């Protein structure tokens, strides 16, 4: 037995293409189909990377097919659907499906119909519904999410975020995330791959101005079928900003220094610097703590307090250094 053929593609536009070919098949067995010379043609329309429609015909097997598929983005609330119809040597079958991605589960509905010919199309019908979910545990943290194939991470908010939701994914914008914390526990990222260095991205819903949630990404290298817990937020979440002036009213421009907690609980001082007009911003501050800023190796300094009830941003307005004695 052998088969050889040739085919080619022609792009009418960037979205529409035609594929055609001819082939010759010789089979030793008398039970095989598609002997001799045959031809095939297919027309493909793909308006986006998620949508594809195709019509196809093969003369050697006397088969035709027509399909349209819209792929889900796997984001929360996304919907995928499609339909395929085939006629093969007289037999006819068709299938339609839809899948939905929710925060805590995914679901698929499909309907398939078959008939030995057009007159008896619908003689066999199969309907299926599938719902997939998971309950994940990691060091005392629980989350309900979609199916987990390998490793996972549970993301939950620090208590000072006052119940705001944490999302696993790039951003809350346009639902660009895969899971969200809430009533049924932590946000579940169930798409980690074992033994691969990869980022876990996160964001916080309605985060208060000035609240420092961190880099928005943590890199991990999971062992086989492992789980992580990741708390989003910290005790040192506040940020302070203001303008620093000299006694004569001129800005303290382009100067560096250190920020030291008066309670002595910080392992290392925080960095401090001003821009060309004396503006500064300090991150990773703790509420109800007094701080001392030392400039230029301690030649000058000033102090400020972070209120105990701050939600994130502390506006220090304008600070004027005291004249040197």
Residue ranges and their predicted role:
Residues 266-268:
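Short, small/polar residue-rich loop motifs at catalytic or cofactor-binding pockets
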Residues 281-284:
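C-terminal tails and terminal domains of large nucleic-acid-associated
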Residues 1-260, 273-275, 287, 292-325:
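Flexible, glycine-rich linker and terminal segments associated
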